[in-house]
């Protein structure tokens, strides 16, 4: 505490002396804007004419370094200096060590008893972290997969790219801010691997030409035997629509052909049935026409009990000759013929059956009255 007060008193004494003496020196060239990474060094140069007595460096309007002809006045070890003399000028360099984001701001170089000053801006960027969820990725050969890389805590936001040390049939990536978190950048790599290798996610700060990378191993395994050849490449939407329309038209055509075929079969069946019925009618008509003359010739009904004389004569001639006898059958034996006679020829009186054996048969003509 006492040392800092002594430094302040020394600066005040020097300023008082310079104010009393006066001078006509000036700043030839002031510092330039600088952008650095956190924890690195920042360098600023200020060129002045000879004859100066006191040169001061300020950061965000606070004096961090003072130089006199006798030597520097250092109040913080993070701020050091270097100087260079030439024939007509003096160059003072301010070095800021272990730069932090809080150091961002205005840096000025000024001379005592001079109205001019040189000003620049210090920008501090932070290189955050990279993260890939898995250090060893295992995927199936020939199947699409994706890998995500997260960049967190970067200011300003980095540009993310990928370096592929693996054979692929297709690869692409897209980087974007995470929704709701503007300090987090995501990059998604889509690829179809064909072999083992490594994938490297690279985040780069364009202003500083500084980058950070993260590498992961990619292991490719063969697809299961059951899944080989099951799924082919996906068809585009237009091809699917075209196939659907073609199948619909084919189905409609098949239905129409089936309907036409059924109609033709029904028509043919009706035609065949009509032809068959016509043939039956024609055959029936022909039979009717043949039967009409025979029916007209017949004048009565057919007598099924008639037998011709020739047939009776032949039957009688074949019998052996017997003597004529008259036999009266017994009552028991005559009952059956009598009953049969009653069935076939009813009559008011019954007589005993008499049979004659005639050696030479006579012709008998039977007449049936209708």
UniProtKB/Swiss-Prot annotation:
Example GO biological process: cell-cell adhesion
Residue positions the entry lists as glycosylated: 33, 45, 146, 196, 217
UniProt PTM comment: N-glycosylated.
Region (Disordered): 284-359
S-S pairs: 46-109, 149-201
Chief subcellular location: membrane
Function: Provides, together with MAGI1, an adhesion machinery at tight junctions, which may regulate the permeability of kidney glomerulus and small intestinal epithelial cells. Mediates calcium-independent homophilic cell adhesion. In testis, it may function as a cell adhesion molecule rather than a tight-junction protein. It may participate in the adhesion between spermatogonia-spermatogonia, spermatogonia-Sertoli cells, and Sertoli cells-Sertoli cells.
Name this polypeptide is given: Immunoglobulin superfamily member 5
Record organism: Mus musculus (Mouse)
Taxon lineage: Eukaryota, Metazoa, Chordata, Craniata, Vertebrata
């Amino acid at each position: 505490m006492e040392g800092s007060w002594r430094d302040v008193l020394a600066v005040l004494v020097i300023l008082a002396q310079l104010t009393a003496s006066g001078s006509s020196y000036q700043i030839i060239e002031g510092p330039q804007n600088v952008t650095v990474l956190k924890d690195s060094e920042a360098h600023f140069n200020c060129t002045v004419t000879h004859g100066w007595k006191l040169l001061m460096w300020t950061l965000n309007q606070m004096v961090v370094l003072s130089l006199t002809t006798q030597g520097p006045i250092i109040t913080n070890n993070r701020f050091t200096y270097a100087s260079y003399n030439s024939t007509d000028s003096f160059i003072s360099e301010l070095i800021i060590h272990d730069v932090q984001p809080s150091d961002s701001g205005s840096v000025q170089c000024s001379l005592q008893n001079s109205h001019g000053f040189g000003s620049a801006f210090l920008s501090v960027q932070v290189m955050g972290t990279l993260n890939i969820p898995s250090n060893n990725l295992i995927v199936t050969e020939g199947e699409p997969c994706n890998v995500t890389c997260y960049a967190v805590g970067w200011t300003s936001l980095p540009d993310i790219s990928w370096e592929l040390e693996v054979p692929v049939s297709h690869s692409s990536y897209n980087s974007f801010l995470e929704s709701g978190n503007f300090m987090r950048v995501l990059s998604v790599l889509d690829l179809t691997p064909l072999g083992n290798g490594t994938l490297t996610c690279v985040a780069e700060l364009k202003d500083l030409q500084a980058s950070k990378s993260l590498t992961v191993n990619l292991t490719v395994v063969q697809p299961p035997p059951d899944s080989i050849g099951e799924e082919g490449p996906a068809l585009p939407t237009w091809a699917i629509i075209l196939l659907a329309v073609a199948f619909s038209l084919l189905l409609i055509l098949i239905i129409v052909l089936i309907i036409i075929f059924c109609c033709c079969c029904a028509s043919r069946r009706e035609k065949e049935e009509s032809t068959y019925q016509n043939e039956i009618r024609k055959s029936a008509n022909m039979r009717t026409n043949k039967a009409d003359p025979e029916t007209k010739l017949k004048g009565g009904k057919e007598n099924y009990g008639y037998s011709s004389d020739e047939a009776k004569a032949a039957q009688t001639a074949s019998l052996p000759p017997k003597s004529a006898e008259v036999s009266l059958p017994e009552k028991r034996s005559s009952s059956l013929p009598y009953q049969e006679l009653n069935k076939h020829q009813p009559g008011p009186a019954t007589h005993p059956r008499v049979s004659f054996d005639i050696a030479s048969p006579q012709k008998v003509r039977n007449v049936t009255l209708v």
